[in-house]
């Protein structure tokens, strides 16, 4: 085999990607570019061998979010390959969300070699710094070029990556300087592939298992402040663990509830199973109505706080103890700063708890009087909602939050975009998301990448329903440019209120109509049917819930991407919802 730079670039790219596949990468998004050619060509060859799935995206920003959606839905590492320069900067929004939502994703970026740095060379920037503030690690191969990198250096880089992801999941930036020539001849490629397949492909590598050691003293400190024989509440926020660990999380939660008999408030994206004993339906409305009457002095909080002002007010004024258990998230996670934080997850906490209490067999404790009262209150509110929200009603956002979980098949996954949908579903969905996987990216809680995230999820979990407002949707239309995106089984429920309706709720009373529109709502007169046709996406517009049910059945049956638009009158939405809330709070 020739020892030319092009051959070494290609071989090292094969070795690097092969090792990343061995630590869990199954899906790879490749973006266009010349500097990343050795990595892209190597990825293509590994795809031919059936080792990794590859999808392409011309927009790095969409690619980052698409990869993040795949990671969230699969529980496995995902990977994005980009060229150098501004391409790397476009990964930042997805890196921010991956950081805050603790999802494993690798950004593999090609760079210029050291000799071209800081001298005005074309398309050469300090890209190694672009993602450093949000990535768990920023690592590099030999700065003089990939061709000068040794095999053991690549192995070491991947071992560091695997250890970091296992310990504290999040984004990793691997910045790879590559010198010319970037392409490779057919003959040289054939020769390198023969060497790789003969020597490296089936080579065994040892990756040490990472043992997550808990802090027993911290646990004992927390236990001293808990009295499991007295009343309390379990609050489950957005789930930040791996989807592969959902079963153990829910089994641990079931044990915790059995030991305590406490009621459970579950966020729509908590991933709590719907058959958990003690679940309080309509808990946010129960809290809004009764927050001054809830008599307990201890709270067990799992994960970050839900997007509920009522809950935040309750926690801020709560005078008892608050314990916050996090899933491999080692940063502070309590904005009200009133909790004992435990970093090592619910499974670890329950394991230590059972050992400390010498419990071999759990005897299920009766529901506490507080649990019974809160559950009954939730059921009373449910009766009011059933009476006031029917399939005959005019479509509004809050009615969608209540009825869509009943119209969309109970086992099919849902993704909620940020802004209005997640808040409406928290208030009105009646635990309807708990029968299925429900996703919403609550790390940074932005509307960035909504479509690309949903398309990524739908590669793994489908048929998927995305519930999104119009601004969140158009913010990421480049998602349709991801390879075969229109062929994915994704149904988009497009809530068209001609602007950011959440700002209507926040600022309508304090601004003139023209100011509100220009500064916050930013309405766009879009012909949605023509927009869908431009991307060759199936489209329907519906005006009532009966037609919406039929549209859902149609979208699932055709197994392709579909946009179902519903128009919302913001004025009617606000007055209608306020009247309902007044009836509930006054009941």
From Swiss-Prot:
Cofactor: Mg(2+); Mn(2+); thiamine diphosphate
Transferase among keywords: yes
GO biological process terms held by the UniProt record: menaquinone biosynthetic process; phylloquinone biosynthetic process
Catalyzed reactions per annotation: isochorismate + 2-oxoglutarate + H(+) = 5-enolpyruvoyl-6-hydroxy-2-succinyl-cyclohex-3-ene-1-carboxylate + CO2
Pfam families reported for this sequence: TPP_enzyme_C, TPP_enzyme_N
EC category: transferase
HAMAP family, per database record: MenD (MF_01659)
Binding partners and assembly: Homodimer.
Function: Catalyzes the thiamine diphosphate-dependent decarboxylation of 2-oxoglutarate and the subsequent addition of the resulting succinic semialdehyde-thiamine pyrophosphate anion to isochorismate to yield 2-succinyl-5-enolpyruvyl-6-hydroxy-3-cyclohexene-1-carboxylate (SEPHCHC).
Protein known as: 2-succinyl-5-enolpyruvyl-6-hydroxy-3-cyclohexene-1-carboxylate synthase
Originating organism: Prochlorococcus marinus (strain MIT 9312)
The encoding gene: menD
């Amino acid at each position: 085999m020739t020892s030319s730079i092009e051959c070494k670039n290609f071989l090292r790219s094969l070795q690097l990607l092969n090792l990343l596949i061995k630590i869990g990468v199954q899906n790879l998004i490749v973006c266009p570019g010349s500097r990343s050619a050795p990595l892209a060509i190597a990825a293509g060859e590994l795809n031919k061998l059936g080792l990794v799935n590859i999808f392409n995206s011309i927009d790095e920003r969409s690619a980052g979010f698409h990869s993040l959606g795949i990671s969230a839905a699969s529980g496995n590492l995902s990977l994005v390959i980009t060229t150098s320069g501004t391409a790397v900067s476009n990964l930042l929004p997805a890196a921010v969300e991956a950081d805050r939502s603790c999802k494993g994703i690798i950004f593999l970026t090609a760079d210029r070699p050291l000799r071209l740095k800081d001298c005005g060379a074309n398309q050469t920037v300090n890209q190694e710094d672009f993602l450093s503030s949000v990535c768990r690690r920023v690592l590099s191969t030999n700065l003089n070029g990939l061709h000068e990198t040794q095999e053991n250096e690549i192995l070491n880089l991947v071992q560091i990556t695997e250890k970091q992801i296992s310990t504290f999941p999040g984004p990793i930036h691997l910045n790879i300087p590559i010198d010319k020539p970037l392409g490779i001849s057919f003959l040289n490629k054939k020769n390198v592939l023969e060497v790789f397949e003969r020597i490296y492909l089936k080579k065994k590598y040892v990756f040490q298992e990472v043992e997550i050691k808990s802090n027993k003293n911290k646990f004992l400190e927390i236990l001293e402040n808990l009295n499991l024989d007295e009343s309390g509440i379990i609050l489950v926020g957005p789930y930040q663990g791996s989807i592969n660990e959902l079963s153990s999380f829910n089994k641990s939660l079931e044990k915790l509830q059995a030991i305590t008999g406490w009621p459970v408030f579950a966020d729509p994206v908590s991933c709590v199973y719907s058959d958990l004993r003690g679940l309080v339906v309509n808990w946010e409305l129960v809290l809004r109505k009764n927050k001054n009457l809830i008599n307990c002095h201890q709270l067990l909080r799992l994960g970050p706080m839900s997007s509920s002002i009522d809950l935040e007010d309750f926690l801020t004024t709560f005078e008892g103890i608050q314990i916050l258990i996090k899933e491999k998230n080692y940063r502070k996670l309590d904005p009200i700063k009133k909790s004992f934080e435990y970093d090592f997850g619910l499974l670890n906490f329950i394991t230590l708890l059972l050992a400390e209490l010498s419990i071999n067999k759990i005897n299920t404790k009766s529901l506490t009087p507080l649990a019974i009262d809160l559950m009954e209150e939730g059921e009373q509110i449910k009766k009011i909602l059933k009476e006031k929200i029917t399939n005959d009603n005019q479509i509004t956002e809050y009615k969608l939050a209540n009825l869509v979980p009943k119209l969309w098949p109970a086992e099919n996954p849902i993704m909620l975009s940020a802004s209005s949908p997640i808040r409406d579903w928290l208030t009105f969905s009646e635990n309807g998301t708990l029968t299925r996987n429900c996703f919403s990216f609550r790390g940074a809680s932005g509307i960035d990448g909504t479509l690309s995230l949903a398309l990524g999820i739908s590669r793994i979990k489908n048929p998927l329903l995305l519930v999104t407002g119009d601004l969140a949707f158009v913010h990421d239309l480049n998602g349709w440019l991801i390879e075969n995106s229109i062929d994915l089984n994704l149904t988009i429920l497009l809530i068209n209120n001609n602007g950011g309706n959440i700002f209507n709720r926040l600022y309508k009373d304090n601004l003139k109509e023209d100011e509100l529109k220009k500064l916050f709502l930013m309405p766009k007169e879009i012909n949605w049917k023509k927009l869908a046709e431009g991307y060759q996406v199936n489209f329907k517009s519906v005006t009532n819930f009966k037609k919406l049910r039929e549209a859902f059945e149609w979208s699932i049956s055709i197994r392709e991407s579909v946009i179902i638009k519903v128009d919302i009158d913001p004025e009617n939405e606000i007055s209608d919802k306020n009247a309902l809330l007044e009836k509930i709070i006054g009941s």
